[in-house]
A protein has these predicted regions:
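Hydrophobic beta-strand positions that form the internal "hydrophobic ladder"
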Residues: 111, 188, 235-236, 289, ...
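Short, conserved, GDST-rich strand-edge loop motifs in beta-rich repeat architectures
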Residues: 116-147, 193-194, 198, 237-254, ...
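Long amphipathic alpha-helical scaffold segments
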Residues: 5-33, 47-166
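Beta-propeller blade signature
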Residues: 150-156, 202-207, 252-265, 304-315, ...
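Multi-bladed beta-propeller domains
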Residues: 160-174, 205-223, 261-276, 311-330, ...
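Residue-level detector of Asp-centered blade-edge/turn motifs that repeat once per structural unit
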Residues: 106-107, 183-184, 230-232, 284-286, ...
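Signature of short aromatic-glycine-proline-rich micro-motifs recurring in repeat-based ectodomains
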Residues: 176-180, 224-227, 325, 330-351, ...
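Asp-box/WD-like beta-propeller blade repeats and closely related beta-sheet repeat scaffolds
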Residues: 197-279
């Protein structure tokens, strides 16, 4: 930097400062990536994937050996501008990426996702900038309704230079929330605003055709969001159908309860009659519906978002996880694990503080149904005990933070972090 400051030509000085900034940014990114290199975890993943049909262990074992060698050699030289150390660090990260992305579970080589263009704010924003509500006690109605640059995309060539194809983009600046792939894998359900800025459930084919609302309703003040497909063609969605609001904010945040809707005959029936919010209905492997419900009255409501399950018609509604406990405060984005009758993954978060993102936990209610008793594993912290922590802002200062996990099986997940 001192040498640059002594440059007499201003244009040369500016160019060299820009080059220095790029170099510092490269080293910062390398340092951040190396913190999560975790060679021991890569070894365990390799040993597990070797057992899967289709994994080319002979191809990737030399990469694993090279990764081990490079880690043993060390990367401290990157801070002195040692070009060999920088090259070694990049090589180690490339080996890790290749080994893990060779997982046969990714052989389909396509992912459908929501993409948000956020420019230079990408390293600073949290989930409200990605279309979620700005707190942990409200539904989608409290989320931003315009000013987004969002689209549904299909990602492919996952193991190489990733390709991206636009499936759909709103024309009104709406966010895109609550993506649910149809059972047939040819179309996707999602939430966006209508022209009058009310939320509704929509569907589009993955080839970009067939865009349409899934819920058609003439009521001028009803909204629908956070939907899920039922196997029989009907859908469950969250709606402001109860016309009530959250008490502690004087009703300013609308409460959403679940409705059952049939697109064929446009019939609708309310399923839940809760004082406060429901979130994230999803079909379990046994055909029941799992969701999160916020209990409020006569208890410490900072700590009472409970995972529930019910039949698709709303009967036999029961607590599944968290009733009677103060940890965790919230469990969002629950998804059943493939091949399991009881286990699921979810994101635990707080009440105030960081909204909707948090720690990623695998639960199994057959092992316990409250607090840490049924928490099988926190990802990515292998061998770290999960400790009960009764705290309002539960995940403030926690890193990494996750949202929207999608299990590929009971060991591997796609998740936004």
């Amino acid at each position: 930097a001192k040498q640059i400051a002594n440059e007499k030509d201003l244009n040369t000085q500016i160019r060299k400062y820009l080059e220095l900034v790029e170099k510092v940014q490269e080293l910062y990114t390398l340092q951040s990536d190396l913190e999560w290199l975790n060679v021991e975890a890569v070894k365990l993943a390799f040993a597990d994937m070797k057992k899967q049909k289709g994994y080319d262990a002979a191809k990737y074992e030399p990469m694993l050996n090279e990764l081990v060698r490079l880690e043993k050699k060390g990367f401290k030289g990157i801070y002195n501008g040692d070009e060999q150390a920088i090259a070694d660090a990049k090589k180690a990260l490339e080996c890790k990426r290749a080994i893990l992305l060779a997982n046969p579970l990714l052989d389909a080589d396509k992912i459908v996702a929501a993409r948000f263009k956020v420019g230079s704010k990408a390293h600073q924003i949290m989930t409200p900038s990605l279309g979620t509500q700005a707190n942990n006690w409200s539904n989608q109605e409290s989320a931003g309704r315009e000013g987004f640059d969002a689209e549904i995309v299909e990602l492919s060539n996952l193991r190489g230079d990733i390709q991206m194809r636009q499936v759909y983009k709103p024309k009104n600046g709406s966010s895109i929330a609550d993506l649910k792939l149809h059972w047939d894998g040819d179309r996707v359900m999602f939430t966006q605003t209508q022209d009058d800025k009310r939320w509704n459930i929509y569907e589009v084919n993955l080839d970009g055709t067939g865009f349409k609302p899934l819920v058609e309703n003439d009521e001028p003040d009803l909204e629908f969001y956070d939907g899920t497909y039922l196997p029989d063609g009907r859908v469950i969605a969250i709606s402001n159908i109860g016309y009530q609001g959250v008490p502690c904010v004087n009703g300013s945040d609308a409460v959403g309860n679940m409705v059952l809707y049939d697109p064929k005959d446009k019939s609708m029936r309310r399923l839940t009659f809760d004082q406060d919010a429901n979130w994230n209905p999803v079909i379990m492997n046994n055909g029941r519906v799992m969701y999160t419900r916020w209990e409020y009255t006569d208890l410490t409501h900072y700590y009472s978002r409970i995972v529930m399950h019910m039949n698709p018609d709303g009967t036999e509604n029961k607590a599944l996880y968290g009733s009677g406990a103060m940890f965790p405060n919230s469990t969002f984005d629950v998804q059943p694990l493939p091949g399991h009758g009881s286990a699921f993954v979810g994101i635990i978060s707080g009440h105030h503080g960081v909204a909707r993102s948090g720690r990623m936990i695998i639960f199994d209610p057959t092992k316990g149904r409250k607090s840490t008793a049924g928490m099988v594993q926190e990802i990515p912290h292998r061998n770290r005990p999960i400790k009960e922590e009764i705290k309002d802002q539960l995940v403030n200062g926690v890193w990494p933070q996750f949202i929207k996990p999608t299990p590929l099986n009971d060991k591997y997940f796609l998740v936004a972090a």
